[in-house]
């Protein structure tokens, strides 16, 4: 049964008035000891709702904190408006991890405010299960044999979709394998 306007309104958090929701603070929690260091972002609102995002891709909370002044007082349900305002501070560099973390936290807040799963706001449910992949970095794996061993370990854990960041150093000695400006790697 497709959602109707009334059914969506019935799911709205009665302790939240989405149009009056405002961002009041942004804080961070560092997760250490997992497979890698991870910084979680928490965006707080005037109605007690908290949205969570992750600062990723080599970014630090310092980069994400630079965005805080652009968020305070804004309605987190205006995800696209806020994203357009902060995306100039992202890109593919380290700052991008802060911008994407903010966007995830905003969607989390909007879903909580309206009482619906985020996927519902992004076009609806497409499938019941999502296949995940496991990233495998190259550090400590200087050759194909060690990388292959690491990939097999992940497969033994049940992963069926693998990603590896091989880099170019594993094939830099192979004639014709790489094309780059003369003298770049000398």
Q: Residues of each region from the PLM?
A:
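Structured beta-strand/loop patches that form or line metal/cofactor-binding pockets in enzymes
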Residues: 5-52
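Short, conserved phosphate-binding/catalytic loop or strand-edge motifs used
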Residues: 124-130
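Short glycine/serine/proline-enriched coil/turn segments at secondary-structure junctions
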Residues: 31-35, 60-61, 141
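Metal- or metallocofactor-binding catalytic centers and their adjacent structured scaffolds
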Residues: 5, 11, 46-116
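Residues that line or immediately flank small-molecule/substrate-binding pockets and catalytic motifs
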Residues: 30, 57, 166
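Metal-dependent enolase-superfamily TIM-barrel catalytic cores that perform enediolate-based chemistry
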Residues: 129, 135-186
